[in-house]
Amino acid sequence: MVKLFKLKTMPVPAIRLSRLTKRYGNFQAINDVSLEVSEGDFVGFLGPNGAGKTTTIHCITGLSNFQAGSIEVFGMDVVKDYRRTRPLIGLCPQEFNLDPFLTIENILVYQAGYFGVPKIDAVKRARALLHHFRLDEKKNLDFRKLSGGMKRRLLLCRALVHDPKILILDEPTAGADLELRHHIWNYLQELNHQGKTIFLTTHYMEEAERLSKTIMIIDKGKIVHSGTKEALTKDQSLEKRFLELTKAAADD
């Protein structure tokens, strides 16, 4: 009797960048970057200011085009299959790009509706998120009436309201006080334990070490390290190099 063996298929990465290149005029923002993010991973994308972190995120989410290379989300090209890939991603940007003419509840409801969530479900999700982040009493205000920390929480709510498979966060705790920072950290860890893939940019080594399973370091548009958190923390020369990069960027 002939036995048939079932071939094992390799899991498709949640995010794959292949030789990504992005220029602004003569400035090389991203230089031939390749990386993979496994489904369910928590990646800390470290780098000093101006290293290329935000540009990488903008390329993944379709906010910026690029000159060469490719980006895939669960095996789908983000350019050719934009309408299929974009709903899979929740983006929490640095800037407060919120509509001042909507209440904060409606900001979330409209965001969910944009990604095809039925109105009744959108309202339920919006209210649940606002309650979790202690914003439910502010739901009828416009975002300009919120403090900086509240705006930061609202951006996270907006990124999550359509229940994406991937959560991309660009410096989500920038300007947050210690209490809010720890609240966000705990919530992100909970989401990751539930299976959500998280890609977080930061220039705080403490934040990356606390949250991440995988740490990648980018500098001057190139990946200079990619590996497990344990590998980075054991290699003191790598940690020292990152601190030097951060200090050099601050001194520029």
List where the protein language model places each region.
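Conserved ABC ATPase signature
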Residues: D142-G149
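Conserved ABC ATPase "signature" region
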Residues: V109, G113, I120-K138
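Catalytic Walker B motif of ABC-type/P-loop ATPase nucleotide-binding domains
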Residues: L167-D170
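Conserved catalytic motifs of ABC-family nucleotide-binding domains
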Residues: D163
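ABC ATPase "signature
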Residues: S226-G227
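Helical segment within the ABC ATPase nucleotide-binding domain
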Residues: R181-Q194
